[in-house]
């Protein structure tokens, strides 16, 4: 695993440990206010933290599937396939006192990049942390597109290593709430 850094999210209302070298996408292009998006400096990998409205009509594993399919619809996925959905142990989460249930999902979505016709199978790992007291579903996503076949610009050992599932797990387990006022009046 790469060295890491503790990073403020949503104006300091949250923080989490991100892999070293993660680039804040909001420095490159507009990002919706309910998202924090980070990209790998070399690969097409990305990490996304989203504050979403609680989907109270779905519970348990179905809630994780709902958000996975919703993301696929937003991204215009041509196909979505869930590989696994598992409950996430609350005791491992920094948000354990606030999170009522947590799920982790792995799957694939067939997505074409902007201005490209060919769709690629992108592996997605998602963690859904449910905070009903704040009417919020926290969705964390790790996008792992297939490796690019372009040759590296420099010696192999100078390029940062791709992020691993361990990097994503560290993001999920380290996510900490510092200011509940981000959710508005309760």
UniProtKB/Swiss-Prot annotation:
A Pfam family matched in the record: Mog1
GO molecular function, one term: small GTPase binding
Region listing for Interaction with RAN, in residue ranges: 27-70
UniProt-annotated location(s): Nucleus; Cytoplasm, Perinuclear region; Cytoplasm; Cell membrane
Membrane topology term: Peripheral membrane protein
Entries under SUPFAM superfamilies matching the protein: Mog1p/PsbP-like
Keywords, in A-Z order: Cell membrane, Cytoplasm, Guanine-nucleotide releasing factor, Membrane, Nucleus, Protein transport, Transport
Tissues where the protein occurs: Isoform 1 and isoform 2 are ubiquitously expressed. Detected in heart and brain.
Any one GO BP annotation for this protein: regulation of sodium ion transmembrane transport
Keyword Ribonucleoprotein attached: no
GO annotation, cellular component aspect: caveola; cytoplasm; cytosol; intercalated disc; nucleoplasm; nucleus; perinuclear region of cytoplasm; plasma membrane
Phenotypic consequence of residue 27 to K: Decreased binding to RAN
InterPro entries attached to this UniProt entry: Mog1 (IPR007681), Mog1/PsbP_a/b/a-sand (IPR016123)
Subunit-level organization: Monomer. Interacts with RAN, both RAN-GTP and RAN-GDP. Competes with RCC1 for a common binding site on RAN and thereby inhibits RCC1-mediated nucleotide exchange. Forms a complex with RAN-GTP and RANBP1. Interacts with the cytoplasmic loop 2 of SCN5A.
Comment field (misc): Overexpression can rescue the trafficking defect caused by some SCN5A mutations that impair trafficking to the cell membrane.
UniProt record similarity statement: Belongs to the MOG1 family.
Alphabetized PANTHER family for the sequence: RAN GUANINE NUCLEOTIDE RELEASE FACTOR
Function: May regulate the intracellular trafficking of RAN. Promotes guanine nucleotide release from RAN and inhibits binding of new GTP by preventing the binding of the RAN guanine nucleotide exchange factor RCC1. Regulates the levels of GTP-bound RAN in the nucleus, and thereby plays a role in the regulation of RAN-dependent mitotic spindle dynamics. Enhances the expression of SCN5A at the cell membrane in cardiomyocytes.
Protein name (database record): Ran guanine nucleotide release factor
Natural source organism: Homo sapiens (Human)
Gene: RANGRF
């Amino acid at each position: 695993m790469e060295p890491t850094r503790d990073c403020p999210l949503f104006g300091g209302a949250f923080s989490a440990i991100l892999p070293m070298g993660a680039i804040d996408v909001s420095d490159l292009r507009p990002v919706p206010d309910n998202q924090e998006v980070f990209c790998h400096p070399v690969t097409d990998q990305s990490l996304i933290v989203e504050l979403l409205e609680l989907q109270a009509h779905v519970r348990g594993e179905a809630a994780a599937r709902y958000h996975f399919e919703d993301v696929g619809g937003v991204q215009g996925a041509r196909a979505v396939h869930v590989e696994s959905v598992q409950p996430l142990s609350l005791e491992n989460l920094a948000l354990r006192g606030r999170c009522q249930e947590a799920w982790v999902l792995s799957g694939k979505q067939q997505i074409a990049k902007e201005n490209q016709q060919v769709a690629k199978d992108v592996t997605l790992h998602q963690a859904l942390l449910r905070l009903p007291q704040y009417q919020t579903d926290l969705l964390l996503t790790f996008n792992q597109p297939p490796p690019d076949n372009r040759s590296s610009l420099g010696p192999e050992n100078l390029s940062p290593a791709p992020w691993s599932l361990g990097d994503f797990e560290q993001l999920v387990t380290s996510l900490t709430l510092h200011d509940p006022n981000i959710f508005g009046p309760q």
